[in-house]
């Protein structure tokens, strides 16, 4: 029973993501979500008290997916640049494989408590990486947020531009971007 409940909640979250990409966050209604998820409208209320609760849990899901993406194939025994490259590529490929997430990036910022969720995450992979690399004397003494904007955020920006401007980024160009964004945060 627990698995079925999790699957249905995931079905509702996937419908939320698709509907946001197609119609926008401000156009979401529980009725539209139910239709998109192929469930009865009342079924959604078995899982979520109201739209705000659904969207807040959805925000947690989106952020958790992003954190899991950073962790994928991460090996802290590798040199710092290799660790960085892995996180950068993880973000890039995650966004290539999840086009609705890419379409919804700006809208996620409008989700209830999304900014608070992002701020309150401590000891995530990126933070730990930054602290260890700073301790080793490799990274600039800037906050994790600033380091992220100068480095991993380039994967997000390029993925977004590649989708909407429709240009192809060859592997050697991506490698060059990874190397240059790494240099941007070095001491």
UniProtKB/Swiss-Prot annotation:
Domain HTH tetR-type: start-end pairs: 6-66
Name of the protein: Uncharacterized HTH-type transcriptional regulator HI_0893
GO biological-process terms attached to the record: regulation of DNA-templated transcription
Annotated region of DNA binding: 29-48
Any one Gene Ontology molecular-function term assigned to this protein's record: transcription cis-regulatory region binding
Protein keywords: DNA-binding, Repeat, Transcription, Transcription regulation
UniProt key word DNA-binding: yes
Transcription listed as a keyword: yes
InterPro entries assigned: DNA-bd_HTH_TetR-type_CS (IPR023772), Homeodomain-like_sf (IPR009057), HTH-type_Tx_Regulator (IPR050624), HTH_TetR (IPR001647), TetR-like_HI_0893_C (IPR054422)
Native source organism of the sequence: Haemophilus influenzae (strain ATCC 51907 / DSM 11121 / KW20 / Rd)
SUPFAM superfamilies reported in the protein's UniProt record: Homeodomain-like
């Amino acid at each position: 029973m627990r698995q079925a409940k999790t699957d249905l909640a995931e079905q509702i979250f996937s419908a939320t993501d698709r509907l946001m990409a197609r119609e926008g966050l401000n156009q979401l209604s529980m009725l539209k979500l139910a239709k998109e998820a192929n469930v009865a409208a009342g079924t959604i209320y078995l899982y979520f008290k109201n739209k705000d609760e659904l969207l807040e849990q959805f925000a947690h899901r989106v952020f958790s997916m992003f954190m899991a993406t950073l962790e994928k194939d991460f090996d802290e025994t590798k040199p710092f640049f290799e660790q960085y490259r892995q996180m950068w590529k993880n973000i890039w490929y995650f966004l290539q494989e999840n086009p609705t997430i890419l379409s919804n990036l700006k809208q996620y910022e409008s989700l209830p408590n999304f900014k608070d969720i992002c701020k309150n995450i401590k000891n995530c992979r990126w933070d730990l990486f930054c602290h260890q690399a700073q301790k080793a004397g490799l990274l600039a003494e800037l906050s994790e947020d600033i380091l992220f904007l100068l480095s991993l955020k380039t994967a997000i920006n390029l993925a977004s531009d590649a989708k909407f401007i429709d240009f192809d980024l060859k592997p050697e160009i991506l490698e060059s971007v990874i190397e240059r964004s790494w240099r941007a945060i070095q001491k």
